[in-house]
Amino acid sequence: MRILIVDDENTKVVEICGVLRDAQITEESITVATTAASALKELKESYFDLLIIDMYLPNRIGEAPSLSGGVDLLKRINRGNDVQLPEHILGLTSNLEALAASEEDFSARSWFVEEVGPSKTTWKLRLMEKLQYLKAREEYQGNQSKSEIISTRPECEVLFVCALLDPELTALHAVSGCDWEVVTFPGDPGIYWSASLKFGANTVSAICVCLPQMGLVAAGVTAAKAITLFKPKLVVMTGICAGRKGDCDLGDIIGANLTWDYGSGKFTEVAGAVVFEPAPFQAAATARVGGVLAELSNDNELLQKLYKESPGYRPAKVPKFHVAPLASGAAVQNHKEFFSGVVTQQRKMLGVDMEAFAIAWACHEALEPQPSWLVIKSVVDFADGTKDSQIQSFGSYISASLAIYAVDRLINR
């Protein structure tokens, strides 16, 4: 594996190399360039599996860094036939202006750009994901057979799935009170975390995974693979969702007792107009999961406790816990007419997300014994175009906290 770091800040290069060392990448595999011009020279002469670019970058030695330096290099790489394209590219910067100027170009090419700073850790997780993928590919190509790969995986009692590294996965790690260890397996590009959850005298083995991207497809594939490999008794998803305005408030929690794909159906023409005819399959939570959700929804003392212990921002009042249907769809919804159209599929529907049904369906179709599924999410917007980014951290915290309590009741009773 060969890695090219393009960065003129020595402090940041040292931090990046620290992550590479943790992933057991040797110094011989790492090349550092301090300008766009020197990086291009390296890319013309050699192939690199991973390219790490600083966004605030000078073009040549002696020139001042430019806010578009990293983006200009990315465009040059994609434009030229004289450059060997790396398999993966990751953008990093501590300059917020450069970050804002580069996000659109990076996302358009399906690459990530992350902020680096004293309190920022997402970039390290993202980099570790890339490294583990590349290492897994190398090991797989080193004649690891499928049976050898699968036999190295431990089984677990609980599998946690989060759609976002930050704030969802970081909140889950924080509230669990455990030391989560990064684990990887030969031939598998995924990165997992393993821990033992302690509930008094009882210990529950747990593995968590973060989706490579949001959405039903990523959630279904990731969950199905993890269920097959780790054989959990329970699959849990925590995080954030949109809620139905007027029936819930920002910060409220939804424990899903029913979920479906609201985009399942067909488009047809009626009197010259295109009409959508829904035909969803609805997956219901087990009676046992539903019972635990009902318990939590009535535990006002627990809700008040978690509200008071919340770090950082919190809503003006203690949130409510609703046990209700949660629909899923493949696209982010951001217009005020959305709920009025979808609620016809299930009049008690209270929220929407992009993953819950995929988790439920992966459990439904799993090899025997099929695991139960549990989805607990917090409302952070109303799918009407209004956003409050402050509430996302609280929503991730409160949903993860309640999920931990639910796991205790479901596994240890």
From Swiss-Prot:
Keywords attached to this entry: Phosphoprotein, Plasmid, Two-component regulatory system
Alphabetical GO biological process terms: L-methionine salvage from S-adenosylmethionine; nucleoside metabolic process; phosphorelay signal transduction system
The chain residues annotated with the modification 4-aspartylphosphate are 54
Entry's Gene Ontology molecular function annotations:
adenosylhomocysteine nucleosidase activity; methylthioadenosine nucleosidase activity
User: Per the UniProt record, which residue ranges are transmembrane?
Assistant: none
Task: Look up keyword Phosphoprotein and say if it applies.
Answer: yes
Q: Which residues form the Response regulatory domain?
A: 2-129
Q: Can you name a GO cellular component term?
A: cytosol
Indicate yes or no for the key word Phosphoprotein: yes
Protein name according to UniProt: Uncharacterized protein y4jS
